[in-house]
A protein has these predicted regions:
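Ankyrin-repeat-protein effector appendages
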Residues: 2-43, 168-169, 178-210
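Ankyrin repeat domain, specifically the short helix-to-loop turn at the C-terminus of the second helix
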Residues: 60-65, 91-98, 125-138, 164-171, ...
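Ankyrin repeat A-helix N-terminal signature
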Residues: 46-51, 80-86, 113-119, 153-159, ...
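Ankyrin repeat boundary/linker residues
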Residues: 37, 71, 104, 143-144, ...
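Alpha-helical adaptor scaffolds
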Residues: 105-108, 112-138
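Conserved ankyrin/ankyrin-like repeat signature
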Residues: 55, 88-89, 121-122, 161-162, ...
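N-terminal segments that cap or nucleate solenoid repeat domains
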Residues: 29-77
Length: 210
């Protein structure tokens, strides 16, 4: 699904209408439900996009298919709830068994969307739900079609708390995307996010040399 505008150290010439902005965790404006959303999934999408956890619970109770069925653009309902930042909806979906590993058309898992939006509480919840340390690392290392990890997305959005959380959980500050950029290079110059990521990468270098 949509994530904050790309910044990979190269000039991106994208139309303004393609840029998606997140402001202090505010949800995106509601998307219009169109023919791309199958009729039997529209109740799920409406609930996820509005953050109505009661409507979502009802829609799930009446849904006979998979909870991980793509609803639009390859997104699952969990992707949408993470994208919009609706924590109660994320909690409900995880309780119902929604997959943390489902990928959308851009290769992103729900954690990518939560990190892109700077939704710290959701990110923490998803890492807690992973269960094992190995699965946590699997999620932290997941890459989308541009080779970005969740940490790349958090860095690009300059979400300090999420960056700190991901680093503490074991995310690599040295992983490069397909443009050869580490997370620090996606944050603006002279920001705390960039400084923390540069320091983390340097520390990782020191450890690897020991």
């Amino acid at each position: 699904m949509a994530v904050p505008g790309r910044r990979n150290g190269v000039m991106d010439e994208e139309d303004d209408e393609d840029d998606v902005l997140f402001d202090d965790g505010d949800a995106l404006a509601d998307l219009d439900l169109d023919s791309d959303v199958p009729p039997h999934l529209r109740a799920l999408v409406e609930a996820a996009e509005s953050g109505n956890v009661h409507a979502l619970r009802s829609a799930l109770d009446n849904h006979t298919g998979s909870i991980d069925e793509p609803v639009e653009d390859g997104d699952t309902v969990l992707h949408l709830s993470c994208l919009y930042g609706y924590f109660p909806c994320v909690q409900l979906l995880l309780e119902r068994g929604a997959s943390l590993e489902s990928k959308d058309e851009e290769g992103a898992i729900p954690l990518h969307d939560a990190c892109a939006g700077g939704f710290t509480e959701i990110v923490q919840c998803m890492l807690n739900s992973a269960g094992s340390p190995d699965f946590v690392m699997q999620l932290l290392s997941a890459t989308d079609i541009e080779g970005d990890t969740p940490l790349h997305h958090a860095a690009r959005g300059e979400h300090l708390d999420v960056v700190k959380l991901l680093l503490a959980a074991g995310a690599s500050p040295k992983k490069t995307n397909i443009y050869g950029k580490i997370p620090a290079e996606l944050a603006d110059q002279e920001t705390e996010v960039r400084s923390i990521l540069i320091a983390a990468a340097a520390s990782a270098d020191e450890v690897s040399c020991q």
